C-alpha cells in the first residue's frame, strides 16, 4: 500500500503538467496503471478473476 502522503501528493495538480502521473485508484501503486480502468495490473487481475469488472474475460487460444 502506498503512503497516504504520496496518494494526496498525486491528487494535487502539479506546477507543470508533465509531472502528473497515474496511481491505482484502489491501492495507490504508481507503476503499470491501466488508464482505461484506473487500476494497476495486480488489482485489475484480482478484480477480473472475481468478475467485478464487466466485459472483462480471461482469454484463451
UniProtKB/Swiss-Prot annotation:
GO terms for molecular function: rRNA binding; structural constituent of ribosome; zinc ion binding. Gene3D superfamilies: 30s Ribosomal Protein S14, Chain N. GO terms for cellular component: cytoplasm; small ribosomal subunit. Zn(2+) binds at residues 24, 27, 40, 43. It holds the Pfam family Ribosomal_S14. Keywords: Metal-binding, Ribonucleoprotein, Ribosomal protein, RNA-binding, rRNA-binding, Zinc. Its cofactor is Zn(2+). SUPFAM superfamilies: Glucocorticoid receptor-like (DNA-binding domain) (SSF57716). InterPro entries: Ribosomal_uS14 (IPR001209), Ribosomal_uS14_bact (IPR023053), Ribosomal_uS14_CS (IPR018271), Ribosomal_uS14_sf (IPR043140). PANTHER family: 30S RIBOSOMAL PROTEIN S14 (PTHR19836), SMALL RIBOSOMAL SUBUNIT PROTEIN US14M (PTHR19836:SF19). HAMAP family: Ribosomal_uS14_2_B. Binds 16S rRNA, required for the assembly of 30S particles and may also be responsible for determining the conformation of the 16S rRNA at the A site. Part of the 30S ribosomal subunit. Contacts proteins S3 and S10. Belongs to the universal ribosomal protein uS14 family. Zinc-binding uS14 subfamily. This is Small ribosomal subunit protein uS14.
Amino acid at each position: 500500500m502506498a503512503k497516504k502522503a504520496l496518494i494526496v501528493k498525486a491528487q494535487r495538480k502539479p506546477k507543470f503538467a508533465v509531472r502528473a502521473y497515474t496511481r491505482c485508484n484502489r491501492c495507490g501503486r504508481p507503476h503499470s496503471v491501466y488508464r482505461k480502468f484506473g487500476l494497476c495490473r495486480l488489482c485489475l487481475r484480482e478484480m477480473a478473476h472475481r468478475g467485478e469488472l464487466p466485459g472483462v474475460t480471461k482469454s484463451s487460444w
